[in-house]
Amino acid sequence: MRQRDITTQFGALTLVEEDDHIVQLNWGASGRADASPVLDAACAQLTAYDAGTLQAFDVPMRVQGGALQQAVCTAMRDIPFGETLTYGDIARALGVSAQAVGQACGRNPIPIMIPCHRVMGAKGLTGFSGAV
């Protein structure tokens, strides 16, 4: 796996690439600056997103996990910039419980790029993995 650190308004982040796909975005720095076209593209897109000039990421990403994890991450990627859904909205669309959706959101391996921050509880913001 290749890794590269990037500093954003969200803090220090580490991108992890495996087999030409981003597979993780971790909070904090790893101290690594591996070379990779996918990491180059992901860093450029995160920088543009951070600057407010990008609204959707198109670098190749792969979510590791079961069918529910993959379905929830796909649903999160489909939420347009500037919009939000509730855990219940996604749960109804997938035919699962809101709690299961919340747990899958909490296990999002690529936060920011897979926008779990666009998913809220029925009464507003709940349980973030980042510094919110």
What are these regions (language model features)?
Residues 112-121:
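Short Lys/Arg-enriched helix C-cap and helix-to-coil transition segments
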Residues 109:
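Acidic, glycine-rich catalytic loops of TOPRIM or P-loop NTPase phosphate-binding modules used
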Residues 1-96:
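Basic nucleic-acid-binding alpha-helical/helix-turn surface characteristic of O6-alkylguanine DNA
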Residues 123-132:
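…primarily DNA-binding HTH/wHTH and HhH modules…
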Residues 106:
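Residue-level detection of the helix-turn-helix DNA-binding "recognition helix"
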